[in-house]
């Protein structure tokens, strides 16, 4: 499933440059994650880098409205980064 940045976000800028899919952007009040681009770092890292670098506990968590299997996240990774080879 895609990740979600909660209202605990302090706009510290730690997560933005870490996303390998460029799924994080500046929202109206806090950073937001585009669920179409978020793969939870599947295909890149073992754990989501945004969660690793975020200084606020439980600020970035699974988005219950975008539940996906690891297989679906892998498919998205391939489409984002390797669609030219399909």
Curated annotation (Swiss-Prot):
Keyword Iron-sulfur: yes
Chain sites annotated for binding [4Fe-4S] cluster 1: 9, 12, 15, 54
One function term, GO molecular function aspect: metal ion binding
Entries under InterPro entries matching the protein: 4Fe4S_Fe-S-bd, 4Fe4S_Fe_S_CS, YfhL-like
Keywords noted in UniProt: 4Fe-4S, Electron transport, Iron, Iron-sulfur, Metal-binding, Repeat, Transport
Ranges of residues in domain 4Fe-4S ferredoxin-type: 1-29, 31-65
Name under which the protein is recorded: Uncharacterized ferredoxin-like protein HI_0527
Residues noted as binding [4Fe-4S] cluster 2 in the record, renumbered to the chain: 19, 38, 41, 50
Cofactor binding mode and count: Binds 2 [4Fe-4S] cluster.
Cofactor: [4Fe-4S] cluster
Superkingdom of source: Bacteria
GO CC annotation: cytoplasm
